[in-house]
Swiss-Prot record:
Keywords in alphabetical order: Bacteriochlorophyll biosynthesis, Chlorophyll biosynthesis, Membrane, Photosynthesis, Transmembrane, Transmembrane helix
Any GO BP annotation: photosynthesis
One GO MF term attached to the UniProt entry: transmembrane transporter activity
Name of this chain's protein: Bacteriochlorophyll synthase 44.5 kDa chain
InterPro entries registered for this protein in UniProt: MFS_dom, MFS_trans_sf, PucC, PucC-rel
Subcellular location, principal: membrane
PROSITE patterns in alphabetical order: MFS (PS50850)
TM regions (residue ranges): 3-23, 32-52, 73-93, 115-135, 144-164, 172-192, 225-245, 269-289, 291-311, 317-337, 358-378, 393-413
Signal sequence segment: none
Membrane topology qualifier: Multi-pass membrane protein
Family statement drawn from the similarity comment of this UniProt entry: Belongs to the PucC family.
Superkingdom: Bacteria
Metabolic or biological pathway, per its Swiss-Prot or TrEMBL entry: Porphyrin-containing compound metabolism; bacteriochlorophyll biosynthesis (light-independent)
Length: 428
């Protein structure tokens, strides 16, 4: 038995929960540390980079799920660890004005938990999707699950932004507690009972060690080339993650709630960008994965250039440009995810989890690297330049990286041909 559309939707709810919790740490808490607490942007940048760096263990989670099974347990366990880490991170933000050293130690511990939680839950979930979804449904399954994740991010950011104003430590802790507890409960209900009904491959007599499994996947030319592309493009994608909200607060005067809402609107743009590609490919038969990846990269570059220009125009409206950035980010992301899901099922069988783990690690390392470099560069240049110029230089570098990623995509995705998202037929 393979996954049906209802089961795919249920697993997508887990992605929704992951996005809802993670956005608290990369958006709300990041903004509070930089603007309200006046801490250097490199501090939350380093913490977020730590949680991404720990996800280098994703290949190990993937290989374990390939050889041992019981992915459901690790999906739920990972979500519980992620939720605990996010709540402790919020507690640390509240403690910073009172006990800086203790708050920093608690923050480090919290983001370690976040990193392990996302790695365990996310990799096990994606491996379950890739291995139990029919090939003709994989790209559509990717679209559904990532749309739900972005929906969770956008709704959480918008809702939290609404209830966070006026800001108070007590209000922050209540909001984070509700979101994290709700995520654990919904994840458990969503994933429970799905895996036991699926067809299970016969386990290997001598399961490979991690390095052996990685060597097998790395020997596949397509998997290797896609890993390099994913690292470069995700570095571009995440370079602004930790500085866009501080930029809105410092240059445009946005409040804490307004910047959190801005993040929600950006992710709303991502949602509609993903939806556009899904409808264009599956319904209207317009374009290919390669074409949409390139479109997303180039459109993101143009939106970033607009954000740079607006910083030097008094009274300029930032929101439309940020929504545009989200829209083209969504176009890029869903096309790249479709290619990734398709490639996960190619090559040697019973290595879907290892491939997803390898690409998840590449994405996580790129996200941590991009976020930390972006925050550090902005901090450094703000010492010598006006805020608008300092942030603008980072956004400009991100725009250039997206152009390079578009050029690379023409080779990497073209090597697979013009793969299309399968049509979702009513009643399936």
């Amino acid at each position: 038995m393979t996954l049906g559309w209802l089961q795919i939707f249920r697993l997508g709810l887990v992605q929704l929960c992951i996005g809802a919790v993670v956005v608290l740490t990369t958006s709300t808490l990041n903004r509070l540390m930089v603007v309200e607490l006046a801490l250097p942007a490199v501090l939350p940048g380093a913490l977020v980079a730590l949680h991404y760096g720990l996800q280098i263990a994703r290949p190990a989670w993937g290989l374990r799920s390939d050889t041992k099974g019981n992915r459901t347990f690790f999906v739920i366990l990972g979500m519980a660890v992620l939720a605990l880490g996010a709540f402790l991170a919020a507690v640390a933000v509240v403690l910073f004005p009172l006990a800086w050293g203790q708050a920093l130690l608690l923050s480090v511990f919290a983001y370690v938990l976040i990193g392990f939680g996302v790695g365990a839950s996310g990799t096990s979930l994606l491996a379950l999707l890739a291995s139990a979804t029919e090939p003709r449904r994989r790209a559509a399954a990717a679209t559904i699950t990532w749309l739900l994740m972005i929906f969770g991010i956008a709704v959480t950011a918008g809702t939290v932004g609404h209830f966070l104003d006026p800001y108070s430590p007590e209000r922050l802790l209540w909001i984070v507690a509700i979101v994290t507890l709700g995520a654990v409960v919904l994840t458990t209900l969503a994933v429970w009972g799905i895996e036991r009904r699926l067809d299970h491959p016969v386990p290997e007599d001598t399961p490979p060690r991690l390095l052996e499994g990685l060597r097998e996947v790395w020997a596949e030319p397509q998997a290797r080339a896609f890993t390099f592309f994913l690292f470069l493009s995700m570095t571009a994608y995440f370079l602004q993650e930790l500085i866009l909200e501080p930029y809105a607060g410092l240059v445009f005067g946005f409040t804490a709630g307004e910047t959190t809402k801005l993040s929600g609107m950006q992710n709303g743009g991502v949602f509609f960008g993903m939806l556009t590609v899904g409808l264009a490919l599956s319904g209207l038969k317009i374009g290919s994965l390669r074409g949409w990846v390139v479109t997303g990269c180039l459109g993101s570059s143009l939106a970033l250039m607009a954000i740079v220009a607006l910083g030097h125009l008094p009274g300029a409206a930032l929101v439309p440009a940020v929504i545009g950035l989200g829209f083209f980010n969504g176009i890029f992301a869903v096309a790249a995810i479709g290619a990734m899901m398709a490639l996960a099922g190619e090559g040697r069988s019973s290595r879907e989890g290892t491939r997803m783990g390898l690409w998840g690690a590449a994405q996580a390392i790129a996200a941590g690297f991009g976020g930390l470099v972006g925050a550090g560069a902005a901090d450094l240049m703000r010492l010598f330049l006006p805020d608008a110029t300092a942030f603008g230089l980072v956004f400009g570098a991100q725009a250039l990286l997206f152009i390079v990623a578009a050029m690379m995509a023409t080779g990497v995705v073209a090597a697979r041909g013009a793969a299309r998202v399968p049509t979702v037929m009513a009643g399936e």
